[in-house]
Amino acid sequence: MTETTEALENPDNPEAETAAAEVTEAPVEAVPAESYVFERPIQTVGRRKEAVVRVRLVPGTGKFNLNGRTLEGYFPNKVHQQLVKAPLVTVDRVDGFDIYAHLHGGGPSGQAGALRLGIARALILASPDDRPALKKAGFLTRDPRATERKKYGLKKARKAPQYSKR
């Protein structure tokens, strides 16, 4: 560190410049990707609308097992597949974990949203450093929107019977 400061302070010294160049040209070794080892699988729950998903995250190769089926078999819609994989893509761990999930209740859209929340919560337990990225992307927020209940005296939740003045 002192060699580089001397080179900056004393531009007339050519030896200091070569020393500074040698210091900056030191090879930087690439840090290998972290492999996660847990004592037991990470288990979380995700909910959306009427859907409830129990997620188990284990180190692996990126396989999905959703009620005994693959991701493509359970969610044939590409939009739902992208929704489910979004937290893994955000933290760049698509091939780092195997995901086993039990999904019940709701429809495909609600189940996909619940699975996304469950995966995001599990990723935080696996690596707390990923929390800011997942939080910024909005994957840790439970979507509170649900079907509004029907009220008595109305035809639906808000639709009133036709009003006649006379």
Curated annotation (Swiss-Prot):
Tell me, what is one Gene Ontology molecular-function annotation carried by this entry? structural constituent of ribosome
For this protein, the record's PROSITE patterns field holds:
RIBOSOMAL_S9 (PS00360)
Matches recorded under Gene3D superfamilies: 3.30.230.10
Please list the coiled coil stretches. none
The record's annotation in SUPFAM superfamilies points to: Ribosomal protein S5 domain 2-like
Q: Which GO terms describe its cellular component?
A: cytoplasm; small ribosomal subunit
List the biased-composition ranges (Basic and acidic residues): 142-151
Q: What is this protein called?
A: Small ribosomal subunit protein uS9
In the UniProt record, what gene is named as encoding this protein?
A: rpsI
